[in-house]
Amino acid sequence: MDFSFWNNKKYRYGIIGGVVLLITVIALAIRLLPMGDLVGTGDMIAGPDAWYNLRLVEVLLASGGFISFEAMTLFPYGQDIVWGPLFTYISAFFGMFAGDAGRTALIDAVSWVPAVLGALMVPVMFFIGKKLGDWKTGLLAGLFIAVVGGQFFSRTLYGHFDHHVAETLFSTLFVLCYVLGLANLNGKEISLKNPSSLKLPLIFGVLSGIAYLLSLLTM
């Protein structure tokens, strides 16, 4: 069999990209398995945290803003909300697709969030593996994160409506940006006397900082 086409970067990158996409779809499909038991029931599987996250989304959709103080807890004083708003805003975006169809439809919509964010870990892990090794390492890393069990899998299931998956995704995205920065700057001379040598450090520094900030905004 002639594999000469593999020497063509266009075809090689297309095939590898297609495999990454396929693994991502498989990761999402696995995480959507609980849908059959949850859709239309108005139920979720993450305990009380899921219901409080739902409250934050409902308040955001109703008022247009994230509440920084919760008057309904620590009675009679209330208390500050100490974690970031990013997961709530992402979930509210999904919730908008439910329209004005009621609370059950909203729950069905936001229940997609952990599954989608969990599946997005596949391309992130692929690029980390590819940069640290090669494309085969990247595919193995993506496949591993798609099917690995334990806490990561359970917290990325449809209906496990909690913010931990967002913490994992954005902190791993920070690692990717950091690794890319180190790899691209390896062996390059950086000097304050040569402004052009500062371009790449600034670009990767900013990207890493943004990814780090996004992870903090989910914690």
Roles of regions detected by a PLM:
Residues 23-30, 113-128, 137-218:
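Membrane-embedded helix bundles of polyisoprenyl
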Residues 23-121, 162-165, 169:
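Membrane-interface coil-to-helix junctions
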Residues 64-65, 97-101, 133, 151, ...:
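Structural motif corresponding to the C-terminal cap of alpha-helices
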